């Protein structure tokens, strides 16, 4: 009977302290090889920077740094009343006092369909191309949720809901008296307006407002200010022409944990994204892919 000799290998011989683990290189990895994950910081940072520069909430409100999805902080409730912080958390105060509150971040998701050839881009090429589109989708959705309570608002509160609840509304044309009366609604609560939320379609209406005595216009088109206060223009069809919002936006706080998650899908039918004829986009039939991006953000109304 023949015996088979076994070759003894010294595995240590093949090991080397000089061998380094492979490092992910976004310039060499193709998107079809990395269809989901957490976006690298070098792409996350400029996207969030663009979001913060363009979001009306972020232009007007105060930024509160967040390391995780929850942030405890203290603020000065400078008058008795109710303060809303986070989703449905109502804090009642009977006197001016320091209040402890918790701000929680909730996920906002956006879906962007693109042609299938994008899968042949490198990771770097893909996200360089998609950065402005992802940022625009994020800040539009954030503002529509936090200001107008649109798009499955995850925060539980919005400026529109606060207006509806307090019924602090002036109805009528854009006149100097109505603008003054609108600001006076805040002054009744010992608050001062510090900005207006409008839209570009309102500019022609604002330019017609004239002081009946001095004949001066209270809207400055060069500085985009009304009655000396800055005007920011929200791009949303849900804010109608002839609607104008004012407030003390120092009471508005927001936070953004610094993570964006993404996933690419090739087969779904997108019920929220429509073709020109109104039919849902079918990725498989139309030879497209869609990237879904999620990021967490929070809003607190004091």
Curated annotation (Swiss-Prot):
Main location: virion
Record carries keyword Endoplasmic reticulum: no
Pfam families for this protein: Phage_capsid (PF05065)
Keyword vocabulary terms for this entry: Capsid protein, Coiled coil, Late protein, Virion
InterPro entries: Phage_capsid, Phage_capsid-like_C
GO cellular component, one term: viral capsid
Coiled coil: 175-196
Disulfide bonds: none
Subcellular location: Virion
Record's keyword annotation contains Membrane: no
Propeptide: 1-14
Function recorded in the entry: Assembles to form an icosahedral capsid.
NCBIfam families on file: major_cap_HK97 (TIGR01554)
Family: Belongs to the HK97 phage major capsid protein family.
Protein name: Putative major capsid protein
Organism: Staphylococcus phage phiMR25
